[in-house]
C-alpha cells in the first residue's frame, strides 16, 4: 500500500451546495438568460479521512464555499451550481441528472489528487475547465491534464494558479465561446496572458567536478539499490540492463530488526545533531527524533551489510502495515547529505535516477518530488517531505532546515529543507523502461511555506516553455528528481552513449 492508492476506498455521498442565484441578468439591451455551469469539487470527503494530499483532517468546506462565491462574484452572468463527487460513479450519476438540467459546461476543481471525476465530464462533450487546488489535487491535475492534451481534447481547458482570480478569468470563457471545441484555445489565451513574464535564467556560479560518460558507466556498475516493500515501480529488469546498477529486494523485517538493535547512545547523538541543525522543531518530540535516528542508523547498517549505496522503502505501506515502526524521512535526509541515496515510496525509477546523479556529480543526490505547477508565478514547485540540506554534495555548503511531522498524516518526523536560491537546477528521470532521458532545468527562486502537502517546496522558474511542461506526466508519472547544477550537457552525453531518446519537457 502507498499513499497514491491508500484513499481509493474512501467515499462520500455527492452533496450539493447550491447558492441561490437569479436565472436572468441585465445586459445592455435587456435581460438575457444566464449560462448554467456545474462546479464539481473532486475529492474524497468534505473533511479528509486519511493521509493524502493536502493532509488528514483537512476541512474543504470553507475552501469550496470561498471558491464558489468568488466564481459567482467574478462571473455574474453565469449561474454556478456546486456539487461534490469522489469518483467516476458519482460523476456519471451527476451527468445523467444534468441531461434535464440545462447545464452548459463544467468547472472541475481537483481537490484531492487521484479522484477520477474530470474524465466523465470531458467525455460529455461540453466545455470543461479543469483547475488545480494547489498542494492538494496537483498529482491528478498534472497526470490527467497531460492525457487530455495528448488526445487533443478541444473541449478541455486547464488552469493551475496560486491566484484564484486566474480561475475566475478562465471561467469567463464560458460566455465567449460559440462551440465547445473553441474552449481549450480560448482559455489557453487567457492563461498565457495571466502567466508571469520570464524573469531570466542568470544564475550564481556553481562549479561541479563531473565524471566522463564512460567513467560514469563504470561507476554505475558498482552501485547497488535495496528495495523494501516491493520490487519498485516498473520493476528492476530495465534498471539493471540499461544502467548497470545492481538491485536487490529485501524484507521489511530486516530494516525493522536493524532499527530495533540500533545503538541507543548513537541514536541520541544523531538526534542531538538534528536538533542543533534545525532552525525550528514543531510537533515532533525528542523521543520521535531518537526513534528516527535509530531508523537512520539501522538503514545505514543494512546498506553496509549488502554493500549497497541506495535504499528505497514503501514507507507508509510499511508503517501502516506494522512492518516498520519509525518514519525514515530524516534518515533518508542524512544519507543523501552523506552522498548515499535514501529514497521514498519504493520508487525504483527515481532511486536509480538519484544514483545516476550522485555518481555523475560526486555526491549530489538531488531529491524526489511531487511537482506542482503555478502559472501565476511561472513556477514549478518540487514538493516532498525528504530533501538533503547539502544541495552541493557532502562537502558543499549547508542550508537551514525545519523538523516537522510527515505532512499528509501529521505523524512521525520529516523536514522542510530551505534550499539555496539563485542557482541552476536540473530535473530528470532516467526512464530505463523506455530508454529515455526526461529533462528540464530552471533557476531556483523561492522556498514556498505552505501547510498543505509535503514540507519541502522548492520553487523553480523553468528554462523554457511552462506550457510544454504540462505534457509528459501521463507517460512518466508524477515523480521527478531535482539536483543542483546545470547538468544538461553531461546528461545528454550519457543519453547518447546509452543510445536513449532525449525528451526536453520545457
Residue spans for each PLM region:
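N-terminal export signals
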Residues: 4-27
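C-terminal segment of N-terminal export signals and the immediately downstream linker at the start
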Residues: 20-43, 53
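Glycine- and acidic-residue-enriched helix-capping/strand-helix junction motifs
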Residues: 46-64, 234
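Trp/Phe/Arg-rich N-terminal binding region typifying the photolyase-homology
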Residues: 56-60, 64, 72-145
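Cap/lid and interdomain-hinge subdomains that line or gate substrate/regulatory clefts
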Residues: 75-82, 139-266
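Short, acidic/small-residue loops that bind anionic groups at enzyme active sites
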Residues: 121-144, 152-163, 335-346
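C-terminal catalytic subdomain
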Residues: 339-446
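Extended hydrophobic packing segments that form well-structured cores
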Residues: 411-506
